[in-house]
Each structure stands twice: as C-alpha cells, then as structure tokens.
C-alpha cells in the first residue's frame, strides 16, 4: 500500500524544495561558492574589476537567497529532482526518537568522487533524509543507483534497529546550523 499518491508526492516535492533552500545553510553555501570563485580568480591574476563583477559583496547572499526562494522555475526544477527520487516512509518502531534540526533535510553521498561533492539532491547515489516526526522519516534515494529500493517507492518500511535511528540522528546533528530538536530532550547522540 502506498503512503501517498503521485499527486501528493508532487505537492510534497514542492514543499521539500522550499524546506531545502530556506535555511541559513543555503546562504552559507552561496557565500562559500563566491569565496572559492574569488580565490580562483585571484590565483589566475584576474583584475579586481572582474573579481568585483563576479563575486558577492558582504550581505549579497541574503538577496540572492531571497531571489532563489521566489524563483518559481528554480523551485519547480528542484521539486522535480525530489519527485524523481524513490521515496520511502520509515516508521520508527524503536524506543529512540528521531531528531530534527534547523536544517532538516540532509543528504548522504554513496558515490565517492575526489573532485566534486556527491551530496547534492541531483548527485548519483545520493540518499536524502527528512525527519518528519519523532517516529517518521522520509528517506529518498537515487533509484538509478539504489536499484533495490525501486519496489518500495511510496511505501512504508519499519525501522526496528536503534542503530539506524541513531545514525540518522548523528547526521541530523552534523547537518544542523545551530539548533537540534528532540521531542523528549534526549540528545545523547550529540555527546
């Protein structure tokens, strides 16, 4: 039995897109990209005029981030990326609750590349996780890489192993910007 329809999956993909880009982490990534570009341009001995033209000034990341959130085409493209992943709803049957954070959607790369990050939602082999409640987590996989998950698209699975819950909790802590949330206040995985 499916936990949601194809139409609901599309609607939730749009919601996930907003959740993914609304965070302070997105602003930090924008600033980091600009800083890396500036470093490369300086190493290439490019003029300050060109560097100023193609890199962000302090505070520009807020405006760019706001424009990203309002860019319907960008949201649609990102929603399509989420939609094309294989979605599984994990039901936590353990005594340990899922954490969430101020940056609730995390990624786990399963393909290694020495030159580029493979943790984007479009990356080959990516696993995306989104704790929805203390007992529910949406896990999304690149189905072309994780072929074994294809029959489980839009299905439930029971999570009976505390190790699985703790691993997602560790990743939620790692992924957070400033705040981690736990229903019962138990943040033992943080230690």
Question: What is the role of each PLM region?
Answer:
Residues 1-191:
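Alpha-helical structural context detector biased toward long hydrophobic helices
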